[in-house]
Amino acid sequence: MTDWLYRYPPLYTGILLKRYKRFFADVQLTSGEVVTAHCPNTGPMTGVSTLGSAVQLSKSANPKRKLAYTLELIQVHDNEPTWVGVNTALPNQIVKLALAKYLFPELGNYSYIKSEVVYGVDKKSRVDFFLTGSDTERPIYLEVKNTTWTKGTLALFPDTETTRGQKHLRELTALLPQMRSVMLYFINRGDCTEFAPGDSTDPIYGKLLREAIALGLEVLPCRFDVTPEGIRYLGLAKLVI
């Protein structure tokens, strides 16, 4: 394959035995050994943390690290056997690689990409990406949200109430129309074809998202194929509002 945006290091297969204290997961490897892995996703992981699920772990070569293993992938069976990426450190890395390759034509022309730019009324927030460089287009403020919860083939965000996410929507909306504001939902599994706000978990977020769209917020629900080999971009899911 030549279209991988990201290639995983060698991974270790196991079975999820327990997830606890947000950061820890006990996993039985195929060798029979039980290890405690770092869980980089501290959210509820609704629908994707079923005990007994197949998982994939990476292993750090750093001897000083307290937990050598990191939980990277969990296999779900909502539609067909599908790997779901659960390492929340990866989406922003992968989006940055995709931006450098200009894989999102919806964003138009830009030549400058900067990460973690301070913005907001109180200047206490950071947007994931700031894009500029075109003389004819407004600068772009782009926020990335990792998305793993689904109902059938409909991806949903958020999977729990998120006051932080609500704040991000308000701040992106406040930039309009002088700037372009873009919310990119990183659908971290390949079995979804549509996207909608998770109204049942956070109706305020859904309301704010719809209001923001009406005022000019752009939404990119981006589908990614996730396997133990790596991650690649599949295009946009249909936005269901």
Swiss-Prot record:
MF GO annotations: DNA binding
Pfam families assigned to the protein according to its UniProt record, in alphabetical order: SfsA, SfsA_N
CDD domains: SfsA-like_bacterial
InterPro entries linked: SfsA, SfsA_C, SfsA_N
Recorded superkingdom: Bacteria
NCBIfam families documented for this protein: sfsA
UniProt family annotation: Belongs to the SfsA family.
Protein's name according to its UniProt entry: Sugar fermentation stimulation protein homolog
Phylogenetic classification of the source organism: Bacteria, Bacillati, Cyanobacteriota, Cyanophyceae, Nostocales
